[in-house]
Design a protein with these regions (language model features):
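Class I S-adenosyl-L-methionine
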Residues: 163-205
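Conserved glycine-rich SAM-binding loop
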Residues: 57
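A short SAM/SAH-binding and catalytic strip from SAM-dependent methyltransferases
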Residues: 114-133
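A short acidic, Gly/Pro-enriched loop at the edge of an enzyme's catalytic core
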Residues: 107-114
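Class I SAM-dependent methyltransferase SAM/SAH-binding core
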Residues: 52, 60-97
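Conserved alpha-helix/loop element of class I SAM-dependent methyltransferases that forms part
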Residues: 30-47, 64
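Conserved beta-strand signature within the Rossmann-like core of class I S-adenosyl-L-methionine
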Residues: 147-155
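N-terminal, positively charged/glycine-rich alpha-helical extensions of SAM-dependent methyltransferases
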Residues: 1-20
């Protein structure tokens, strides 16, 4: 099963629900705001930085940044593999830079100070755990080469009473060893925001 099936799933969600949280398969709007805030905290108050929203969907993270006046000190760009998301973002935000590419096929994008991946790795759909892990780690390695300061991403937690077969639950220990061996020992695990997932910040130094 190809990881492209995940992109098709999100395309189906957008066609069914339109430009809202359901269109990117987030069930609760209020939870999306929590996730946006957690992603933004990767910057730790750093200003005048370039930021890539990898798997930007419908540009909702930029809308969050703007509504909180965070956009004034971040040079935002978005990237998505999904053609519908890309075209919608270009129409909504013609003054911003968006990329439509599969980074595992074509990684010809510039470097950014920070990269955030919000919801990019939370669903595996029909992929096996091993297939999703291969996709996940391959993308992280690509992104690590494209960031100057740090990246943030979220995955589903295994510290739950039960797991969903279509979601990507990752052991914190397993992930920690991958990060240490392939990216950096300088990482922070955020498991403090009451959702059944966790967010990881990985810093260059």
């Amino acid at each position: 099963m190809s990881y492209l099936s995940i992109a098709k799933h999100y395309d189906d969600c957008f066609k069914k629900h339109g430009d809202n949280n359901l269109g990117v398969d987030w069930p609760k709007y209020e939870d999306t705001l929590i996730r946006h805030e957690i992603m933004f905290q990767l910057l730790q108050g750093d200003e005048n930085v370039s930021l890539l929203d990898f798997g930007c969907g419908l540009g909702h993270f930029y809308e969050f940044l703007k509504s909180h006046n965070h956009h004034n000190f971040t040079n935002y760009s978005g990237l998505d593999i999904n053609e519908s998301f890309y075209q919608t973002c270009k129409q909504k935000f013609p003054f911003l830079n968006f990329y439509h590419t599969d980074i595992l096929v074509n990684d010809n994008i510039p470097n950014f100070d920070y990269i955030v991946c919000n919801g990019t790795f939370t669903e595996k759909r029909e992929l096996s755990q091993n297939e999703m892990m291969e996709f996940f780690t391959s993308v992280l390695k690509k992104l690590w080469a494209k960031t100057n300061k740090g990246i943030a991403f979220n995955v589903m937690s295994k510290l739950v009473d039960w797991e969903r077969d279509d979601l990507f639950h990752v052991s914190i220990d397993e992930l920690g060893w991958f990060l240490k061996n392939n990216l950096s020992r300088n990482f922070v695990i955020r498991n403090d925001y009451k959702l059944y997932e966790y967010t990881v910040y990985v810093y260059k130094k």
